Amino acid sequence: MSSGVAARRDAKKLVRSPSGLRMVPEHRAFGSPFGLEEPQWVPDKECPRCMQCDAKFDFITRKHHCRRCGKCFCDRCCSQKVPLRRMCFVDPVRQCADCALVSHREAEFYDKQLKVLLSGATFLVTFGDSEKPETMVCRLSNNQRCLVLDGDSHREIEIAHVCTVQILTEGFTPGAGSTRATGMLLQYTVPGAEAAAQLRLMAGEDASGSKRQAAAWLAAMHKATKLLYESRDQ
């Protein structure tokens, strides 16, 4: 892909919605696969009372809409302003207590796990039915739209084409209940092909530092997969 085309795909613009300022992609098709669309606000005439505490709205008790769920609340039930990066808001926005809790948890993904995914890790990669794995660095692209694999060859898999993700684990010690991630089995569609393609990533057995990095990357990918499924189910 030429630098000009890549720049157009990654271009963003600042827009103002009823909920606040958002930095969104120039072209909607090039948005992050982890993103969420803004909700439709419940019309004012349909919510004469707070949808949490049932307080009646009047001149004193003002009505507020949660920017994440779109429901109506009084100030007491919708007072928190929390970052909502999945909707591309520039500043923290007003959210109800339940939504604020979810957004706080997601902030950890953007502050920690996303950085791990962008940095990448080294895996033994097997494509399809191949019996010979290839050592490759797997990372998430800067625009969050592709898994990029670099080794003797170069591959890119669009996150939008991913069908299923299975994290492969093994026990820490015999008989123990705790497990650790050692690999990932991923199925994705290929344009023009009827059957889904398969990719297996396995952490190498060489350097302990490399294994820890791979385990952290797999854990981050597990969290990313949950966000991906939520975005698709919206």
Swiss-Prot record:
PROSITE patterns xref list: ZF_FYVE
Q: What is its main location?
A: other
Q: Where is this region: PH-like?
A: 107-234
Residues engaged in binding Zn(2+) 2 = C66, C69, C96, C99
Tissue spec = Widely expressed.
Zinc-finger ranges (FYVE-type): 44-104
**Might you report a single GO cellular component term?**
endosome
Q: Which Pfam families match?
A: FYVE, ZFYVE21_C
SUPFAM superfamilies according to UniProt = FYVE/PHD zinc finger
- Tell me where the signal peptide lies: none
Provide the function of this protein.
Plays a role in cell adhesion, and thereby in cell motility which requires repeated formation and disassembly of focal adhesions. Regulates microtubule-induced PTK2/FAK1 dephosphorylation, an event important for focal adhesion disassembly, as well as integrin beta-1/ITGB1 cell surface expression.
- Assembly: Interacts with PTK2/FAK1.
Protein name stated in the entry: Zinc finger FYVE domain-containing protein 21
The record's gene field reads: Zfyve21
